[in-house]
Amino acid sequence: LTKDVILNWKDKVYIFKNKSEFVVFYLKEAGYDLSRILYNSLATPFLTTMNLPNSGQDVLFWQEPITDSVPGNMRLLLESNHRQTKIVVQDYTAYTNLLKLVSPEQASRVAFLGFMYPFARQNNFQNQALILTNSDQIEHLESIVSEVPTMHYHVGAITEMSSRLMDLAKYSNVSLYPNITTEQVKRLYKEADFYLDINHQNEILSATRAAFENNLLILAFTNTSHGPEYTAPSNIFSPMNAGQFKQTLKEALGNRDFLSHLLDRQREHAHVATPEDYKKVIG
């Protein structure tokens, strides 16, 4: 077996040694403007740009980790003048690590740019908290429920609930949703303004991402946090410091300015970008 690509086109047979050769042929044949290519992989897209004419101003969007070395093909990009390429890193840790590994001249071709998120709504400052879980192991839940009674807690699971969880129905400020439906989840994301990421074991329904995109304030413990990229570090507490978790919850409930401040820090930590940020970085 070879990796050749064979194309029958306009009564001719073309044989390409690899996929990137085929892509170059396709792009030229289609008549696209090739003066600028935006891509997010150092595999076929990178090899394709290396086979294009020299005149070009490309952008590589890099969304993978970088630790102690620069990926080989990325180093080729930085050392080559074949086509001027800006490297836009979308993970902040990877960005700071990369800057330590390249020369000042190369660093001028590297930029950081966060993601834009489709925020569904604003936080309404209501005393409604959501927890989605398929485990009855929920860190400090009963003490939180009893010690922060002004909050109403909605606990949903896509399976049946154990007797341990069902016993929480004795609290008037707890609503339980065993076998929760998609419609119920959507409704609760609209009604709740807090998400407590305090369940052990796996996350369900991409809960923290959904909470973030609905502008719910996310609070978690270090041993339960499923979405640290969406949760401000100051809102992730040691399980040994549950008192501070509860105090933060109480303060956020009683002070809109404080809750707004926490939400701002949450978005800042996630490096939320705007269309203006994208225009500034990539033009």
Where are these regions (language model features)?
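Short acidic alpha-helix that forms the nucleotide-activated donor recognition element
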Residues: 181-192, 213
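Conserved catalytic-core segment of nucleotide-activated headgroup transferases in glycan assembly
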Residues: 115-170, 179-182
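Acidic donor-binding loop of glycosyltransferase active sites
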Residues: 190-203
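A short, active-site helix/loop in glycosyltransferases that binds the activated sugar's phosphate group
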Residues: 70-109
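Short hydrophobic beta-strand element within catalytic cores of glycosyltransferases
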Residues: 217-222
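A charged, aromatic-enriched C-terminal amphipathic alpha-helix characteristic of glycosyltransferases
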Residues: 240, 253-283
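N-terminal pre-catalytic "stem/leader" segment of glycosyltransferase-like enzymes
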Residues: 1-56, 238, 272
